[in-house]
């Protein structure tokens, strides 16, 4: 286990070296419209949907000055009463960066948590099958097989790196949202 952790930290350090700030186009989208409101979810059915939802996302530096604003606007999108979800990935609002919100059913009061550059570094062989939907194409639901447990790494908004084990429905949500970062939809 110690070798796995050391290897993981080495990989994290090398990946963070490739992280970049938001592009000019991404910056424009983040500050577009009323910045006190949510960012619009991009449906897969729209031409924009395929552009963002089928593309592999890039790592982001955690010190980009627009990151807190994007974080808040994504949170408003996933918790909006018109389309409440249990998770959201940045590509769903038109930003191809490795950023997700996940509802933590494994914590008291089930808070949402923001993950920067999330990675799944191990997954259990024990699988579970469950019914999943998606904010980007609400009309499609289906059975999806996911790992019951996963070991993840991520950076928080303060720039602190974490390694954590997730299980059950929280692990399912995390896997679903990280799939979005690879352009994968309802696997």
Show where each model-derived region lies.
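Bacterial Sec-dependent N-terminal signal peptides
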Residues: 1-21
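Positively charged
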Residues: 17-187
């Amino acid at each position: 286990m110690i070798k796995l952790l050391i290897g993981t930290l080495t990989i994290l350090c090398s990946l963070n070296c490739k992280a970049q700030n938001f592009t000019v186009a991404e910056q424009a989208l983040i500050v577009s419209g009323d910045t006190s409101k949510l960012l619009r979810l991009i449906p897969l059915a729209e031409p924009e949907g395929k552009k963002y939802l089928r593309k592999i996302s890039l790592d982001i530096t955690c010190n980009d000055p627009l990151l807190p604003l994007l974080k808040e606007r994504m949170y408003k999108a996933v918790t909006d009463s018109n389309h409440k979800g249990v998770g959201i990935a940045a590509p769903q609002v038109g930003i191809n960066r490795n950023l997700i919100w996940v509802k933590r059913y494994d914590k008291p009061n089930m808070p949402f948590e923001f993950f920067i550059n999330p990675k799944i570094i191990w997954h259990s062989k024990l699988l579970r099958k469950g019914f999943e939907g998606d904010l980007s194409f609400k009309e499609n639901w289906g059975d999806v097989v996911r790992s019951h447990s996963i070991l993840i790494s991520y950076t928080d908004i303060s720039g602190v790196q974490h390694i954590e084990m997730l299980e059950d429905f929280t692990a399912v949500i995390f896997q679903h949202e990280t799939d979005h970062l690879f352009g994968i939809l309802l696997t």
